[in-house]
């Protein structure tokens, strides 16, 4: 089983799809990565040789933050916004949607289950 950036890539998937299992690499970045390394997108993960695997590893480490580093960076950005007290930081602190979505209805994922108020009738 091929292992890149601390993630076991699925054996029987095409490389284009298998690379998206790494946090921080989506379909577009996977295509770009395969073009840089000259690996066919249709190649299966279990058909990779060691040279191709090391080429992928080198390009990923040199070019992008992925997995743990990226997760830490995102959390640090959120903490910084909370500390400086900007609008997005306040929304994070209150557990509300950050990017301008409506909250009168919807937003249940972010707000959690409904809190019923006793004595409120129509």
Curated annotation (Swiss-Prot):
Q: Which InterPro entries match?
A: Rbsml_uS13_C, Ribosomal_uS13, Ribosomal_uS13-like_H2TH, Ribosomal_uS13_bac-type, Ribosomal_uS13_CS
Q: Cellular component terms, GO, for this chain's entry?
A: cytosol; small ribosomal subunit
Q: Where is this region: Disordered?
A: 95-122
Q: Which residues form a coiled coil?
A: none
Q: Which UniProt keywords apply?
A: Ribonucleoprotein, Ribosomal protein, RNA-binding, rRNA-binding, tRNA-binding
Q: Does the keyword Magnesium apply?
A: no
Q: Where is the signal peptide?
A: none
> Which biological process, per GO, is one annotated for this protein?
translation
Specify the superkingdom: Bacteria
Gene Ontology molecular function terms on file: rRNA binding; structural constituent of ribosome; tRNA binding
Q: What Pfam families has UniProt attached to this entry?
A: Ribosomal_S13
Task of the protein: Located at the top of the head of the 30S subunit, it contacts several helices of the 16S rRNA. In the 70S ribosome it contacts the 23S rRNA (bridge B1a) and protein L5 of the 50S subunit (bridge B1b), connecting the 2 subunits; these bridges are implicated in subunit movement. Contacts the tRNAs in the A and P-sites.
The entry assigns this protein to a family as follows: Belongs to the universal ribosomal protein uS13 family.
PANTHER family named among the record's database cross-references: 30S RIBOSOMAL PROTEIN S13/40S RIBOSOMAL PROTEIN S18, SMALL RIBOSOMAL SUBUNIT PROTEIN US13M
The annotated subunit structure for this chain is: Part of the 30S ribosomal subunit. Forms a loose heterodimer with protein S19. Forms two bridges to the 50S subunit in the 70S ribosome.
Record protein name field: Small ribosomal subunit protein uS13
Q: Show the taxonomic lineage.
A: Bacteria, Bacillati, Actinomycetota, Actinomycetes, Mycobacteriales
* Gene that specifies this protein: rpsM
